[in-house]
Amino acid sequence: GTWSDDTSMTLCLADSLSRGLNYNDIMQNFLKWFKKGEFTPFGSAFDIGNTTRQALKRLEQGAAPLECGGNTEYDNGNGSLMRILPLLFYLQSVYGREFYQEDEAFAVIHKVSALTHAHKRSQIACGIYIAVAGMLLGEMNLKEAVNLGIGKAMEYYQNQEGFVEELKFYNRLKDKDFADLPSESIRSGGYVVSTLEAAIWCLLNTENYKDCVLKAVNLGSDTDTVAAVAGGLAGLKYGYTAIPQDWLGVIVKREYIESLCNQFYFAITR
């Protein structure tokens, strides 16, 4: 029932967004997590990624929050993708259910990624993920929602200078037979493209929350992050009540997490 950096950084973002969108405030929460062990199950930060660590070091050295993120090809780990989901609810509260029609909404996604991961490839992963997540809250069937979310994000990026060159890395997601790929061809390491692919593949190949998360874990490699990213989507599709009670019962600091989530919900819906 313990949890790692994925959950901690997601809670950091949700807590900060409760007070509105402030990039410095988000980074200060990340620092509180890394330096003081806040937003953790046992009072100390666990398993921080290298790109995130470097970004926080730059912040401490005086860099502006939006100048901290790594922007080289080697900075495309899954560290911004794994924490981005709370932003969906903020964007819907500001721009409405069709936030993906707004360039400004994508700009916010990219900036929240860029706090730690500023390369266009990581930003695209976050954009696709948030677009798919938004569609899962609608009435469409699973496959339709996923395809429409991917399609809307691709549509946006195809017209964006600097991003269009990176789209080729996401070609497999556009393939109508993507869900039918065998598990051996799904990579589940720390590379952001692999993590996004694995999460969507697990979602498309299962029919409930529990099976989706277990499939992600069973892919091996970066299991906590792939399961967190896949579980985020499955949670939106199947709802809170679909999470197995025996899993919820053993979560460390469950009341703390639920209270922070409630605070976030009330802040963005008031």
Predicted regions and their residues:
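Structured, active/binding-site neighborhoods that engage oxygen-rich ligands
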Residues: 1-270
